[in-house]
UniProtKB/Swiss-Prot annotation:
This is NADH dehydrogenase [ubiquinone] 1 alpha subcomplex subunit 7. Keywords: Acetylation, Electron transport, Membrane, Mitochondrion, Mitochondrion inner membrane, Phosphoprotein, Respiratory chain, Transport. Complex I is composed of 45 different subunits. Belongs to the complex I NDUFA7 subunit family.
Length: 113
C-alpha cells in the first residue's frame, strides 16, 4: 500500500470505508514506548540510580562477623577482678527447647551393623 499512487489509495480508502494509510504507522500498538518510567527498585545496597559505585553496592562488603547474643561463660570486664565462684554457680543456664537426647548405643545382638 505504501507504493500505491494517490488515485489508487483514494480508491482503496473509498472501497474499504476507512483510511487505510493512517493506520500503517500505528499497526503495532504493543511496542514499548520510547520514554520509559524510571525503575522501582527495592531498597537495598544498590537502590540508588546514580552515584552508586560498584564497590559500594556490593552486598558482600556489608557482611560482618556474627555477634554473640548469649554465652554460657561470663566475660570479664577489663580492669575488674574476677568475682567469687559462688556467684558463678548461681548463674542461670541457657534455656533449651527439649531435654537432652539420650546417647545412642550400638545393637548388642547384631554386631555387624
Amino acid at each position: 500500500m505504501a507504493s500505491a499512487t494517490r488515485v489508487i489509495q483514494k480508491l482503496r480508502n473509498w472501497a474499504s470505508g476507512q483510511d487505510l494509510q493512517a493506520k500503517l504507522q500505528l499497526r503495532y500498538q504493543e511496542i514499548a514506548k520510547r520514554t520509559q518510567p524510571p525503575p522501582k527498585l527495592p531498597v537495598g545496597p544498590s537502590h540508588k540510580l546514580s552515584n552508586n559505585y560498584y564497590c559500594t553496592r556490593d552486598g558482600r562488603r556489608e557482611v560482618v562477623p556474627p555477634s554473640i547474643i548469649m554465652s554460657s561463660q561470663k566475660a570479664l570486664v577489663s580492669g575488674k577482678a574476677a568475682e567469687s565462684s559462688a556467684m558463678a554457680a548461681t548463674e542461670k543456664k541457657a534455656v533449651t527447647p527439649a531435654p537432652p537426647m539420650k546417647r545412642w548405643e550400638l545393637s548388642k545382638d547384631q554386631p555387624y551393623l
